[in-house]
Amino acid sequence: MKEGIHPNYTEVTVKCLCGNTFQTRSTKPEISTEICSACHPFFTGKQKLIDTAGRVERFKRRYGM
């Protein structure tokens, strides 16, 4: 292997929008994510409501339905 061409692989903190943080290793200095295992519906068993009513109404208006 050549020396000096590989990025540093260090321990970083991953921050989720829900406020959860955890440690992992990466070549990036900081990682942020929208969904993690603490807030993902598959792991929590809770279903999040996604506002699609606006999209459906816009589709109906656009195509005359």
Swiss-Prot record:
Signal peptide: none
Note on how the cofactor is bound: Binds 1 zinc ion per subunit.
Key words, A-Z: Metal-binding, Ribonucleoprotein, Ribosomal protein, RNA-binding, rRNA-binding, Zinc
GO molecular function: metal ion binding; rRNA binding; structural constituent of ribosome
Keyword field contains Zinc: yes
Cofactor: Zn(2+)
A Pfam family this chain is assigned to: Ribosomal_L31
UniProt-annotated binding residues for Zn(2+): C16, C18, C36, C39
InterPro entries (UniProt xref): Ribosomal_bL28/bL31-like_sf, Ribosomal_bL31, Ribosomal_bL31_A, Ribosomal_bL31_sf
GO CC term, one of those recorded: ribosome
A biological-process GO annotation: translation
Hydrolase in keyword set: no
HAMAP family linked: Ribosomal_bL31_1
Record note on quaternary structure: Part of the 50S ribosomal subunit.
Function, as annotated: Binds the 23S rRNA.
Family, per entry: Belongs to the bacterial ribosomal protein bL31 family. Type A subfamily.
PANTHER family: 50S RIBOSOMAL PROTEIN L31, CHLOROPLASTIC (PTHR33280), LARGE RIBOSOMAL SUBUNIT PROTEIN BL31A (PTHR33280:SF6)
Name assigned to this protein: Large ribosomal subunit protein bL31
Species whose genome carries this gene: Geotalea uraniireducens (strain Rf4)
Origin organism lineage: Bacteria, Pseudomonadati, Thermodesulfobacteriota, Desulfuromonadia, Geobacterales
